[in-house]
UniProtKB/Swiss-Prot annotation:
It comes from Prochlorococcus marinus subsp. pastoris (strain CCMP1986 / NIES-2087 / MED4). PANTHER family: CHORISMATE SYNTHASE. Belongs to the chorismate synthase family. NCBIfam families: aroC, PRK05382.1. This is Chorismate synthase. Keywords: Amino-acid biosynthesis, Aromatic amino acid biosynthesis, FAD, Flavoprotein, FMN, Lyase, NADP. GO terms for biological process: amino acid biosynthetic process; aromatic amino acid family biosynthetic process; chorismate biosynthetic process. Pathway: Metabolic intermediate biosynthesis; chorismate biosynthesis; chorismate from D-erythrose 4-phosphate and phosphoenolpyruvate: step 7/7. The gene is aroC. This reaction introduces a second double bond into the aromatic ring system.
Amino acid sequence: MGSSFGKNFRVTTFGESHGGAVGVILDGCPPKLKINIDLIQNELDRRRPGQSKITTPRNEDDKLEILSGLKEGITLGTPIAMMVRNKDQRPGDYSNLEQVFRPSHADGTYHLKYGIQAGSGGGRASARETIGRVAAGAIAKQLLKNLFNTEILSWVKRIHDIDSQVNKNKLTLSKIDSNIVRCPDDKVAAKMIKRIKELQQDGDSCGGVIECLVKNVPSGLGMPVFDKLEADLAKALMSLPATKGFEIGSGFLGTYLRGSEHNDSFIESDDISKLKTISNNSGGIQGGISNGENIEMKIAFKPTATIGKEQKTVNADGKEVLMKAKGRHDPCVLPRAVPMVDSMVALVLADHLLLHQAQCSIIK
């Protein structure tokens, strides 16, 4: 319970941060889809620890192992099982935290729910769990790209109080990945990197905002009322570790506008299936259904909860204790969270694509 996501394009992740391996079982992927395995590994490399001086120093190569579901790079329509082995576990780093509830971690709430919790690395609450999501999301991205040329681009918009403004018309994956913080504005990226390093040296951390743009979105994805596309996107993205906020389109800023300013008027077209709007305050979704415009979202991530400063907390007996984290951690999660955001968006869109085809493509 709680480890599966999706209806038709369904993922189930498994494993803990300091266990033997982490992975995913992807069920419902259409057969005969050609998969570039190198692209899956590339997404895992973008997510892996130890990739720069502003990420956790945990040294994992995150080499992908595909156990089932593919034959010579072609999907069989059967469950696709993928796994990455953990090779640099150091559970001893957490020996002083046994039965201690770290502030703003899942230790306390896991203990309250289950009466027991993983003693090291956060267990299932660790960002290491997202390896399975990223692997499955890489397949979803290829499905969407092959069928509709859909492109999902996420980048770091803000770190702490350092914000960026990006020309979305010129945005590319190579530009996003051109620096270690994954902000396509090089001048702002340099300031972000400096801030992260300063906080890291002080034993502290920071959060920020990731922005996501989806191009070439098929119209008609999503369902009314309880299965609205933006509702499922919100659930997917808010399920990522450290997320605390979600906006789509104009978001909260839209509340400052009048209806006459906010409405997205349609443009006359000879092809009703390719309607465009003058503005895109709706963020590509109206009535819970995609309208074919770009989907635009922002996701807020809190500061990394594991910090190098001494803090007061309590243990499993409710007694106050002083603690100082020794484990390896990211001073800011956002640079590595970018491919996680991409993957969750891809999984939602792939799932809704299959749902749409199942309901609306039988009778022409």
